[in-house]
């Protein structure tokens, strides 16, 4: 057994040294991804070492803007989880230039965000996607502090590799648990005094304040007809959603919360996609692959007996959507399939270090789930006070982190900061249709909904999300 462990460690170390040798920008240039249509913009992918001693490296995928990349801003994208891949979700399922079409095939995404900016997708923390730590004990205790510090080191090293982007307007964006990752990283940048030209942050359906965000789930369930009046009454009087989450994070439910959990489970079928309550689900790729990609931040624990048992049940995918909107219901499964082809990994300069397969959400990282309870809305406020522009946006069909809680938090923050509404709450129009609702405070803090959008709004509502992204970069209100 000892000799086997030594051999595994030796192989990991050899992989680390091989990866680190390919350290220049040109070494990381992608000639072409298998199955991709012809494009004129450049793509890069590879590793940045964030801890030489522990041999910890983060994987990135970088796509330059379709046109005039030298004049367009740099945008860092972080997916949440905690522990889910920005390459698998952000790049290949949401707003990257390509979408997997089954097998080793890619199609163009006509609403790619690299129409407006140079986009950098980072798999973080180590243990997520292709990112790794040779010292696997790192995976046992990952938290927000470590993640933010590693992300900052990554940026410092990345700018050394891509010096042309050092003085470019810089934005940090993300969704879900990136409501922690993004403001914490932005705050580190501001505090460090590093010469990054940080202009703003954008957060989609973000976790910002545990109780407010979680309790809005219960109201959302009831207001959208997913639970009965009597169950909602039980939620508000016996065990609310934030209490249910807290007990779930700690591994067991009290009798009161057990009863509430059972009622919710009985009334909301598993075939309901909690990331988009109006969505159909992918059936053609089967449930086996979906279990591998299960998103850890789920709206309902359903763990009355054990968390392990809960994870084996069929679940809805955060990447499903209405067939009537011509959205590929099975893009998550196709992404999983595509990124596990060996020739795709070779084209991306990616390696599987200590894992058998790439997965959309980490199977090895033990993230400190109590970090979910750390409020970050105050960090957002300090960024606004520092002159950093902030956009909070919400797909309005998401029950996991509903727009209701986000809107309340932004409104309260504006009051605390003494910011008046410079754009009153109103609908915004995209292509002669209502794209959602928006409100702006002090021309620096904005809240916007994306009508019909899911938890991953750029996937489910790509056209409206691109319109919002374009306005955000320009610093202009939506029309």
Residue spans of the language-model regions?
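Terminal and linker regions of secretory-pathway proteins
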Residues: 1-479
